[in-house]
A protein has these predicted regions:
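Short, polar loop motifs at secondary-structure junctions
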Residues: 71-78, 234-237, 258-261
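Short beta->alpha junction loops/turns
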Residues: 51-52, 93-96, 149, 175, ...
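Short, basic, low-complexity termini and linkers enriched in Ser/Thr/Gly/Pro
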Residues: 84-87, 244-252, 266
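Conserved beta-strand segments of alpha/beta enzyme cores
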Residues: 89, 142, 252-254
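Adenine nucleotide phosphate-binding catalytic loops in nucleotide-utilizing enzymes
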Residues: 49, 210-214, 250-268
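Phosphate-binding loop of NTP-binding sites
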Residues: 98-230, 234, 240-250
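Conserved beta-strand termini and adjacent loop/short-helix elements that scaffold enzyme active sites
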Residues: 19, 23-25, 93, 146, ...
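N-terminal leader/targeting and accessory segments in enzymes
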Residues: 1-102
Length: 268
């Protein structure tokens, strides 16, 4: 993945200052941020991630294609294999995936669009696309909608990197593969509005019950301010109410269902 990225080196360093032993005196400006060495361009910030292979292995390739700097996890052995000149381009972090989220959250907080986050056991993508269609009257640069399945800790930041001063509405899909992920994604996104589509049996092998799944989904409020709005289905709304009461939050709760006549309608 790659996205436009207009930040100075000093700005990125300031986000991770406690981990740095920085020796360079220049302050170049990045033009791109990428997790793929094959997509790296000149003036990129390369973020190596661990998957089937360790992304740190591709740091030399990214540097050969013009990367200005790269993130690197503290004490990673790849550093000892690099020249002194290339070592000087390392921005040391404790975890590259978490660092990507920190950078994305910093970018998101520079702007003030309405951000609507969608999660649930099913129907997330359809709902996200429908909401995107409802805001289709906006100019192209004013609307950002999650593309493809970019709904996890890797893809979500690249949705947020598309936000600019012209952006008025952002529709984000938040997915979940393991416990705690929705909370982390919400803290990165900081939604102004959130919608839970439903609570089904997806992930029940890990979470054991629909109630536990509902608890996990409501963690979408983790990054929401008290002026935010949460839309939830009516079948487990008692859990949502109890959670909000326990947290003593003033997030507004709107319960919806598929059966009764709606009391809210969308107008252009």
């Amino acid at each position: 993945m790659i996205a436009p990225f207009e930040y100075s080196l000093s700005t990125i360093l300031s986000l991770f200052s406690k981990d740095q032993d920085w020796k360079r005196t220049d302050n170049p400006t990045f033009r791109w941020i990428t997790t793929s060495s094959s997509e790296t361009k000149a003036r990129s910030l390369f973020v190596p991630l661990r998957g089937t292979r360790d992304g740190h292995e591709f740091i030399p390739d990214a540097l050969s294609k013009g990367a200005t700097a790269f993130l690197c996890e503290k004490n990673h052995p790849i550093l000892k294999t690099l020249s002194n000149a290339d070592q000087s381009k390392a921005i040391v972090v404790s975890d590259c995936l978490l660092a990507l989220g920190v950078i994305a959250s910093y970018h998101r907080m520079r702007f003030k669009p309405m951000i609507l986050a969608v999660t649930g056991s099913s129907g997330k993508t359809t709902t996200k696309d429908l909401l995107g269609g409802l805001f289709g009257f906006l100019k192209q640069k004013s609307l950002v909608v999650t593309e493809k399945n970019y709904n996890n800790e890797i893809g979500l930041p690249f949705t947020l990197f598309r936000i600019t001063e012209e952006t008025r509405v952002v529709i984000c899909e938040l997915g979940m593969n393991h416990r705690g992920e929705i909370a982390r994604l919400s803290r990165i996104t900081k939604p102004t509005h959130a919608l839970i589509t439903n609570i089904g049996s997806a992930h029940i092998e890990n979470l054991k019950s629909r109630e536990a799944i509902a608890e996990e989904k409501i963690d979408i409020i983790s990054g929401m301010a008290e002026s935010s709005v949460l839309f939830v289905p009516d079948d487990l709304d008692f859990l949502y109410r109890a959670k909000l009461k326990k947290l003593k939050t003033k997030i507004k709760l709107i319960v919806w269902n598929h059966k009764e006549k709606p009391n809210l309608k969308v107008k252009k």
